[in-house]
Each structure stands twice: as structure tokens, then as C-alpha cells.
Amino acid sequence: LYVIVATGNIYEDVVQAQAAARQGADIIAVIRTTGQSLLDYVPYGATTEGFGGTFATQENFRIMRKALDEVGEEVGRYIRLCNYCSGLCMPEIAVMGALEGLDVMLNDALYGILFRDINMQRTLVDQYMSRVINGFAGVIINTGEDNYLTTADAVEEAHTVLASDLINEQLALLAGLPEEQMGLGHAFEMDPMLENGFLYELAQAQ
């Protein structure tokens, strides 16, 4: 069970994350504040204000990892922590995540190219370096194909998701990321009323 917290205040995120873990959550994802992907630096320290999410900082990572370890002891299982390693500081955030014991990173340059107008060469180089780091640190990466379908029809544009999955797989392999650490993005976003919709989704996922 994958649960998202995003209050903007890391200390309030901790309360929500621990409550979610007690209710059965396996992975806690802390969404980043709006616009952090366009910051050319990583903010410092614990943060208590964000917009639509919480700043990704090394201290925030440490606070949340500690909180999940505490609740993990309480419930008798390990709780994974996920954050976002995309935008203009992919390698820096990858290093922070490796140092602070994160388990999963959303790690995809293509989203930044398509939706944030980030320079393609720069961000693909950044992605390569961040995936080398994630691979070495044992961090699982997720890619962001589900984002493409927020502005397009999931049937008509299914080929774009598939193409991106194949590109992301090859870029991850080139960076030395083991296959067991690859989480290629897919989301069930076809209209539930579509005839054979589930078969289409299943076929694409396979």
C-alpha cells in the first residue's frame, strides 16, 4: 500500500506518515513542494512551509526516515520511504537520499523535458548520474509515465507511455541500474466503461 503525504510541514507529514503506517501502509511518499524541480539548488534544513508538498531537503529526509523506523518497530515491519529525484537537482537529491536511507525515488528526466521545459542535454546527463548513484545505493527508481496521461486520452496516447517505458528502461540499464531496482511507470487511467479496457491495460503493462 502506497500512501502520499504532502502537508508542506515535515513535522505534520511525520504524524500523517506514522498514522498511515499503523493502518497498513508499506511505502510513504512525500510529495515535493510545487516548483522545487525548477530550483537550481537544494534547500537546507527542516522546513515547515510548502505549497502542494514539502521541500526535499536532507534534514527532512532524515526526520522522516527516523519517524518511519520508529513506527516500523511499533508495527513490526519495515516502512519504505519515497521521494522525488527529478528536475534541476537530480544527482544532488540522489546523494541525499542515499545518505539518509531512502528506498524509492521518482527519477525521470522526460517529465521535466516535456512539462517543465528543462534543457534536454543537461537533464539527461543529470538523470544518468542520479541513476548511477541510485543503483549503487540500492534505491529503487520509479519513472513518471502516468503523468503524461493527465493531459491526454489513455487509449489514444497509450503508445507514448509504452515508448517512454522502453526509453527509460534502456537509459536505466546504461546507467548500470539493476532490473530489480527499476519501477517503470504505469497507471490504470483508461475509462472504466471502455469495452475490454482492462485487457488493454493488462496488455500494455505486460
Predicted regions and their residues:
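Anaerobic metallocofactor- and corrinoid-dependent redox/one-carbon enzyme cores
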Residues: 1-206
